Amino acid sequence: MDHETIGSEDWEELILNLEATIPVYDRINRFATIGQVDKWRRMVRERLPSEDAKILEVGCGPGSFAEDVSGVDLVCLDPSVLMLEAAKPRVNSKRQERGESEVEFVQGKAEELPFEDNSFDGTCSLFSFRDWYDKRAGLGEVIRVLKPGAKVVIVDPAKINRIHGVLGWLWMRVWVGAYARIICGVKDHPWKWLTKTYVTFGTTRDYVRMMEDVGFENVSAKVVFPGMATIWEGRKPES
């Protein structure tokens, strides 16, 4: 496991641990981000096309972001059937309340997106990119399915440098770990595995370079308050 790839055995174990977070996912995520996660999700929505657009969320999890996305044709992809089963009623009930069409839920991996070239007006990934088993391959697939000129927006933990990374690890390992242990009621809680993926996650700059390497233009990275997350953006070239 390194900043680009996760081995197949590790990835399968990671998926099992992610599925174990479903009952308390939002509660612990809100605690881990000091209540900022909803603000970050709003920032992503503001960066994506908002009218008559077709948007793909890669790694939708239990639907925490998708439930508040409105005015667009939304497709949610996740490798976990259990995540999709949790997300579908949650998201589509909100869509029905707003008089919108249901979201399309698709099981699949970022590295093998089951969509045709130039299919989407925008893509996003929130707290999922870190868990892709091959980030470079996944970004290559994202740029393939985007329409020319369309944008990808990614949110995941910030790691400005080694010192910042150590502080982030301490936060995840000690503070969030203690809270997760209380909420989950077990010592061997699934957030231990998520801390492991944070350790091997690269720096903010690593993924700027990676996005540029696979062909994205106008790539930017913004570390957002309180220094716990990064928002990466990039556009597919017009031609």
Locations of regions flagged by a protein language model:
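N-terminal, positively charged/glycine-rich alpha-helical extensions of SAM-dependent methyltransferases
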Residues: 1-24, 183
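Conserved alpha-helix/loop element of class I SAM-dependent methyltransferases that forms part
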Residues: 33-51
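Class I SAM-dependent methyltransferase SAM/SAH-binding core
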Residues: 56-112
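A short SAM/SAH-binding and catalytic strip from SAM-dependent methyltransferases
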Residues: 121-134
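A short glycine-rich, Lys/Arg-flanked "PGG" loop and its adjoining helix->strand segment in the class I
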Residues: 136-151
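Core SAM-dependent methyltransferase catalytic element
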Residues: 214-239
